[in-house]
Amino acid sequence: MEVIPAREFNGLFVWLDVVFLIFFVIILIYTKRYIAGIVGILGGILYFIVDYGIFFLALGTRVVEGADTFLLLLWMSMSYGFTNFVWIWLWLDRDKRTFEWSLFILAGWICVALLSQNFGASFGDIVTTRGTIRYHGVMALILFVGYAILIIKNIKGKEKINIPWILAIGILVQFAWEAVLLVTGIRSMETMPIIINSLIETNLGLPYLFLIHRAIMKKRNEDLTLRPAE
């Protein structure tokens, strides 16, 4: 089944989002969430490799109209890659301020979208589309393998991993920004992209990110200081 996520926004949306991202980084530094910030940057780079390198160059399924493809996809990847990975990492941290972080991110997304619609009439329109039929099966396989690893660990091991909690993070983070795009009119009014993307796209990485998080946080605190040896 072909699901084609599409977005339409103006150039002001990009610039406002860059301001939001800079503000987000400043807050992360101020609150000493250093590892979350580093993971966010790496997540943005990963998104760019996938979106530009695979979807655009290798498969030709990514289409950008009204902007330079390289720069636009670099911004999109760093924007949603950084924000998603930071948000997920803070959830995995079981950060005591998870609600505040979540509200900050969601309110920021909504604010950027609506401000750009109010004041961006003089900026050019940008449209992005992405076909999925050539790779959603591979994504589903990656998702299956990841959760299978956690399931096998639970079956064989003494320590029980909270798989429903990990699954909820993977689905809800993607659903949240898909919903913001939908209600602000940036995403076309279709239900399948939000359903399929929420179940697969961010969620496929959660088992692996959980294992990475657990390995790192055994040795380091969020501010990069060493944890005492157990």
Could you tell me what each predicted segment is?
Residues M1-E230:
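Aromatic-rich, lipid-facing transmembrane alpha helices and their immediate juxtamembrane interface loops
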